[in-house]
Amino acid sequence: MLSRAACSTSRRLVPALSVLGSRQKHSLPDLPYDYGALEPHINAQIMQLHHSKHHAAYVNNLNVAEEKYREALEKGDVTAQIALQPALKFNGGGHINHSIFWTNLSPNGGGEPQGELLEAIKRDFGSFAKFKEKLTAVSVGVQGSGWGWLGFNKEQGRLQIAACSNQDPLQGTTGLIPLLGIDVWEHAYYLQYKNVRPDYLKAIWNVINWENVTARYTACSK
């Protein structure tokens, strides 16, 4: 089960500016399954490149950007601090998003959630089928690169679907707490599904880890 700390993923992965000087470097998280475990829905080549190359690049570039930011803070160089914001957002978002994404998937996934999450989905979207249709449509409809998300609106106490461009993190962009993210960057599917994003969306539902999504919902909805 996830702790309530799961509600603050971005705060946990991107350290406060006040502790940048003593921070530990970010590292690439291990996958909770083998690269080929999600086949035939997502093949091993995609998973290996996606995790060991793309996510690793976000981690490395985030560490570089944070080190440069620390130096700019020490020098009082506000211009440099401002110039580094896009790199921090892009690479920090990439690290946050993918760290959630890997745990949202499972070789034993698919089907429907149970319990409180399923009831919340029915309450906020009418039915699981309608929810699935809406999140699929939002994800397919992302122009260029980005993510489709199921998030929790803490203030309103309800689930919401949203899209984020590029690697913009859901919580930092919309305030929604991320529960389920679907990566629709081409690197997530092109080697297997070419330019047919809807086929990738149809396949990914077979490996959604509803236990993980439910744990995130439980941690954030109390």
Swiss-Prot record:
It is found in: Mitochondrion matrix. Keywords: Acetylation, Manganese, Metal-binding, Mitochondrion, Nitration, Oxidoreductase, Transit peptide, Ubl conjugation. Its cofactor is Mn(2+). Its EC number is 1.15.1.1. GO terms for cellular component: mitochondrial matrix; mitochondrion. It catalyses: 2 superoxide + 2 H(+) = H2O2 + O2. Its main location: mitochondrion. Residues 1-24 form a transit peptide. GO terms for biological process: cellular response to oxidative stress; regulation of transcription by RNA polymerase II; superoxide metabolic process. One of its GO terms (molecular function) is manganese ion binding. Binds 1 Mn(2+) ion per subunit. The modification 3'-nitrotyrosine is found at residue 58. The modification N6-acetyllysine is found at residues 68, 75, 122, 130, 202. Nitrated under oxidative stress. Nitration coupled with oxidation inhibits the catalytic activity. Signal peptide: none annotated. The modification N6-succinyllysine is found at residues 68, 75, 122, 130. It holds the Pfam family Sod_Fe_N. PANTHER family: SUPEROXIDE DISMUTASE 2, SUPEROXIDE DISMUTASE [MN], MITOCHONDRIAL. Destroys superoxide anion radicals which are normally produced within the cells and which are toxic to biological systems. Belongs to the iron/manganese superoxide dismutase family. Homotetramer. This is Superoxide dismutase [Mn], mitochondrial. It comes from Bos taurus (Bovine). The gene is SOD2.
